[in-house]
């Protein structure tokens, strides 16, 4: 890649800045960490690795980066692409081989959504491998749009107000998951991926499925953004500005014991009868 144009340079700086802010805000990476960067071969994880490698050079702390890809034995998966790319940039890497593809195809009827089971199987395998190599953090490539889509999916279809946190302690208590791209937009990541000409590997399982609930929500959010530019940013800001007393979850706020404060200063209004 040659010299960047002004706009390309701004894009790169913006992504690096936003990733750095997210890492700082949530204390994602600490001195001495060994960060296992989960690389799928998609635009998001390539961008995450690229930015983390840059931040590793300029950060005031020292941390290791190990790239890990999970070969799920999907038919036609180009096994050579990631090793060749990672060797070319000099990054330590591991390829974890686990035939989750056959399990998913066996358990999920044809035409049904495979994403949930596929994700659980992949996550469990990666958690175990993180333990094996002594990784202290596991970095995933989810971005701002993913987080918002998950929020609306859970609200519309699950009846819960939850999304993807930028930093998460896994259920096993042994893995800390971080999402350095939490503040970055998918639009910027797509543009950066094209700029850097990453060797993208398509997903033959979920990537080709149509009419998924997530795709419906994605299109809804894109339409909102088209009609009201900036709405996505405002909605994401709302996830960082929660007011439990203005919702209805009794576990988050003690509504039952709300009482008049006898010591509160009375407020009197002058009323004019017309």
From Swiss-Prot:
InterPro entries: Rossmann-like_a/b/a_fold, TilS/TtcA_N, tRNA_Cyd_32_2_STrfase, tRNA_thiolation_TtcA_Ctu1. The thiolation reaction likely consists of two steps: a first activation step by ATP to form an adenylated intermediate of the target base of tRNA, and a second nucleophilic substitution step of the sulfur (S) atom supplied by the hydrosulfide attached to the Fe-S cluster. It catalyses: cytidine(32) in tRNA + S-sulfanyl-L-cysteinyl-[cysteine desulfurase] + AH2 + ATP = 2-thiocytidine(32) in tRNA + L-cysteinyl-[cysteine desulfurase] + A + AMP + diphosphate + H(+). Its cofactor is Mg(2+); [4Fe-4S] cluster. Pathway: tRNA modification. [4Fe-4S] cluster binds at residues 115, 118, 206. GO terms for molecular function: 4 iron, 4 sulfur cluster binding; ATP binding; magnesium ion binding; sulfurtransferase activity; tRNA binding. Catalyzes the ATP-dependent 2-thiolation of cytidine in position 32 of tRNA, to form 2-thiocytidine (s(2)C32). The sulfur atoms are provided by the cysteine/cysteine desulfurase (IscS) system. It is an enzyme of class 2 (transferase). Homodimer. Binds 1 [4Fe-4S] cluster per subunit. The cluster is chelated by three Cys residues, the fourth Fe has a free coordination site that may bind a sulfur atom transferred from the persulfide of IscS. It is found in: Cytoplasm. It comes from the Bacteria. It comes from Pseudomonas aeruginosa (strain ATCC 15692 / DSM 22644 / CIP 104116 / JCM 14847 / LMG 12228 / 1C / PRS 101 / PAO1). A motif (PP-loop motif) lies at residues 40-45. Disulfide bonds: none annotated. The keyword 4Fe-4S applies. Belongs to the TtcA family. It holds the Pfam family ATP_bind_3. This is tRNA-cytidine(32) 2-sulfurtransferase. GO terms for cellular component: cytosol. The keyword Iron applies. GO terms for biological process: tRNA thio-modification. The lineage of its organism: Bacteria, Pseudomonadati, Pseudomonadota, Gammaproteobacteria, Pseudomonadales.
